[in-house]
């Protein structure tokens, strides 16, 4: 069981407990071994096969459980495998209520479960609590949300979601994808969620040099099911990736803070140019701002931008130099993309349109570069696109 957090999150990120290396290495060693020798048949050791357990992975999981305010944490090969392991806790024909503005890969996996296992999935605008409540049934098995959502950056009241779910579907698993905020800015388990998961590829690692997923829970029963699924499917993170993730986590506080401060300036800058910008807290008087800061400690560093013209958006994306055209977010470098053509292209256009995922939507993921350089890059892109303020 992980230790309770004793210090501020910035300190806890750096100090890793549970390293039992016999040589007292200050950095957790990479146990790059598929199997482990046993002392004898009668007394098996703590580890036998890396698919089931590995010393490097064990230290990482204890560290993540502490940071995510969980009793148990598990690391998987990528973020989608983390969600897959969670969904495998549900039986065939389960009823799922999920946000309608989800990461495209999550939407694709839910659609697969609809076809393959008879899942009944209702996608709703989770920022509309009345619509969310109407979608719930007494036999709802799982609720899946993001806040902020990806890519529109809509805010849903994660506290109210818990209260409504417990009153209408008390046995449903409450699951939140916290990738946008990371443990530095939000701890959903503190608000009553059964499971929180993240793509470790993003802020947790921070350098786009590994693929990984994290699942955290306070429930022994859920942990037992999740571990069985990971072990049975062979979905656990490999030792080298565990080492990289342990290293990346140590600087996450600094990275998130710098990227977040840059993002605040970039959001204000783009808004001043007449663009529609969705970014948490950009409008201090908006109701969504008060809701957001009831569960988050900062806005993060991802925003959605609407130009009103697809060709203008394409020119902006193609013209930037420092903002690299790429999917993903949460690394030290700034990225830019058009979700309708990239991360959410697997969703049919008519469905995207119904969910407000317009073709002109640009997702900007701000990194830790000099903010004046970033603004100059965007200024030039806007000029090249001949964007005119309405």
UniProtKB/Swiss-Prot annotation:
A GO term for molecular function: pyridoxal phosphate binding
Entry's transmembrane regions: none
Entry's Gene Ontology BP terms: 'de novo' L-methionine biosynthetic process; transsulfuration
Group of enzyme by EC: lyase
Pfam families found in the cross-reference section: Cys_Met_Meta_PP
Subcellular location: Cytoplasm; Nucleus
Alphabetized PANTHER family for the sequence: CYSTATHIONINE BETA-LYASE, TRANS-SULFURATION ENZYME FAMILY MEMBER
Family annotation (NCBIfam families): cysta_beta_ly_E
Family: Belongs to the trans-sulfuration enzymes family.
Protein name: Cystathionine beta-lyase
Species whose genome carries this gene: Schizosaccharomyces pombe (strain 972 / ATCC 24843) (Fission yeast)
Recorded name of the encoding gene: str3
């Amino acid at each position: 069981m992980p230790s309770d957090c004793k210090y501020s999150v910035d300190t806890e990120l750096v100090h890793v407990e549970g390293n039992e290396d016999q040589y007292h290495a200050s950095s957790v060693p990479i146990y790059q071994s598929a199997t482990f020798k046993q002392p004898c048949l009668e007394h098996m050791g703590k580890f036998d096969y890396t698919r089931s357990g590995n010393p490097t992975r064990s230290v990482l999981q204890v560290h993540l459980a502490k940071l995510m305010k969980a009793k148990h944490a598990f690391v998987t090969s990528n973020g989608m495998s983390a969600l897959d392991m969670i969904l495998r806790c549900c039986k065939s024909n389960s009823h799922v209520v999920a946000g309608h503005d989800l990461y495209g890969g999550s939407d694709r996996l839910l659609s697969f479960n609809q076809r393959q296992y008879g899942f009944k999935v209702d996608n709703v605008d989770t920022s509309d609590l009345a619509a969310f409540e109407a979608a719930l049934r007494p036999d709802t098995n799982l609720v899946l949300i993001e806040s902020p959502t990806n890519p529109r950056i809509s805010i849903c009241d994660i506290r109210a979601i818990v209260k409504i779910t417990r009153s209408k579907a008390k046995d449903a698993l409450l699951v939140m994808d916290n990738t946008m905020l990371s443990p530095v800015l939000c701890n959903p388990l503190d608000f009553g969620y059964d499971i929180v998961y993240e793509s470790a590829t993003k802020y947790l690692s921070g350098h786009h040099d590994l693929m990984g997923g994290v699942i955290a829970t306070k429930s022994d029963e859920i942990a037992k099911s999740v571990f069985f699924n990971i072990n049975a499917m062979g979905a656990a993170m490999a030792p080298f990736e565990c080492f990289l993730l342990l290293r990346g986590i140590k600087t996450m506080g600094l990275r998130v803070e710098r990227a977040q401060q840059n993002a605040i300036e970039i959001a204000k800058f783009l808004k001043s140019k007449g663009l529609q910008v969705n970014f948490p807290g950009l409008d201090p008087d908006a109701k969504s701002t008060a809701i957001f800061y009831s569960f988050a400690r900062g806005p993060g560093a991802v925003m959605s931008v609407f130009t009103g013209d697809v060709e203008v958006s394409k020119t902006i994306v193609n013209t930037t130099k420092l903002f690299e055209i790429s999917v993903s977010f949460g690394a030290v470098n700034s990225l830019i993309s058009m979700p309708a053509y990239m991360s959410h292209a697997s969703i049919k256009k008519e469905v995207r349109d119904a969910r407000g995922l317009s073709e002109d939507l640009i997702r900007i993921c701000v990194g830790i570069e000099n903010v004046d350089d970033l603004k100059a890059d965007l200024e030039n892109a806007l000029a090249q696109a001949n964007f005119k303020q309405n």
